[in-house]
Swiss-Prot record:
HAMAP family: Lipoyl_synth (MF_00206). Binds 2 [4Fe-4S] clusters per subunit. One cluster is coordinated with 3 cysteines and an exchangeable S-adenosyl-L-methionine. GO terms for molecular function: 4 iron, 4 sulfur cluster binding; lipoate synthase activity; metal ion binding. This is Lipoyl synthase. It is found in: Cytoplasm. Its EC number is 2.8.1.8. Coiled coil: none annotated. Belongs to the radical SAM superfamily. Lipoyl synthase family. The gene is lipA. [4Fe-4S] cluster 1 binds at C68, C73, C79, S308. Pathway: Protein modification; protein lipoylation via endogenous pathway; protein N(6)-(lipoyl)lysine from octanoyl-[acyl-carrier-protein]: step 2/2. Its cofactor is [4Fe-4S] cluster. PROSITE patterns: RADICAL_SAM. Gene3D superfamilies: Aldolase class I.
Length: 321
């Protein structure tokens, strides 16, 4: 039996190379079998791309990454033109192979010790008032990257004292308590961790993750920081039923999660999980009504909603869909 080829540090694996060794094998989609994208998912492009170019140049100049680009978010043009970006720390290579996600897999490089300062300076130069900080999974690090998150928050606040910071964190697999000890030294203004889908779809969509661990992470953070809102996001279109999603919403509320995002899954390439259905806007409206009934303080539900889509407006309790 041949051993898998050892990954080289810093090499990005995408598409077929990325998903070649996950538990549920994916058959590449043929064009004639892919569902046609409905009109309600068509994205309007901004009249000018000047602000988009400015943000991209600022990121390149400082060697920073945005999840908007790395994960091929459909809202990139709108958010960049609005002057917002979700920064992705700890590199652009993830140690996991989730087949819904377009972020590259591989063996990451050592964290950049200068990244927290460069990030803080970039945010100051961009005159941002609300930022979202996320990361790839770093299962190679003893703390899962928690200290780097804390360092980034500290440096950002040094140079930007009036800023609001939302963190979208990984699950810190097997290191939850240690990670929370570290994160508690520099708590964010909003703590976000995405469940992504219903538990019965984890094996195919989130190999290496655990539904209950993710719920526990959200609950334990809230127990330590009762005044910091907790938030989670889900995708639809992976084969789940609306009742399965409804149960996830109940589970989130049972674990004291207050904010919700719910959007449509879009297949990044033919090598990723296929879209099993496009969920009509009316069904998102029904799930939002349920979320409101369950007591979420804010629920952004719509086909193009993403976890950090207009996160500043979400945090202010304004309608986003």
């Amino acid at each position: 039996m041949n051993r898998p080829e050892r990954l080289q540090p810093g090499v990005k694996l995408r598409d077929a190379d990325k998903v070649s060794r996950i538990p549920v094998k994916i058959v590449p989609s043929e064009r004639d079998t892919m569902l046609r994208k409905p009109d309600w998912l068509r994205v309007k492009l901004p009249a000018s791309n000047q602000r988009i170019l400015e943000i991209k140049q600022a990121l390149r100049k400082n060697g920073l990454h945005s999840v908007c680009e790395e994960a091929s978010c459909p809202n990139l043009a709108e958010c960049f033109n609005h002057g917002t970006a979700t920064f992705m720390i700890l590199g652009a290579i993830c140690t996991r192979r989730c087949p819904f996600c377009d972020v590259a897999h591989g063996r990451p490089l050592k964290p950049d010790a200068e990244e927290p300062v460069k990030l803080a300076q970039t945010i100051r130069d961009m005159k941002l008032k609300y930022v979202v900080i996320t990361s790839v999974d770093r299962d190679d690090l003893r703390d899962g990257g928690a200290q780097h998150f804390a360092d980034c928050i500290r440096e950002i606040r040094k140079l930007n004292p009036d800023i609001k910071i939302e963190t979208l964190v990984p699950d810190f697999r097997g290191r939850i308590d240690a990670a929370l000890d570290i994160l508690s030294t520099e708590p964010p203004d909003v703590f976000n961790h995405n469940l992504e889908t219903a538990p019965m779809h984890y094996r195919k969509a989130r190999p290496g993750a655990n539904y209950q661990w993710s719920l526990d992470l959200l609950k334990r953070f809230k127990e330590r920081h009762p005044n910091v809102p907790t938030k989670s996001g889900l995708m639809m279109g992976l084969g789940e039923t609306n009742e399965e999603i409804a149960q996830v919403l109940r589970d989130l509320r049972a674990h004291n999660v207050e904010m919700l995002t719910l959007g449509q899954y879009l297949q990044p390439s033919k090598f990723h999980l296929p879209v099993e259905r496009y969920v009509p806007p009316a069904e998102f409206d029904e799930l939002k009504a349920l979320a409101d009934e369950l007591g979420f303080t804010h629920a952004a539900c719509g086909p193009l909603v993403r976890s950090s889509y207009h996160a500043d407006l979400q945090a202010q309790g304004k309608e986003v869909k």
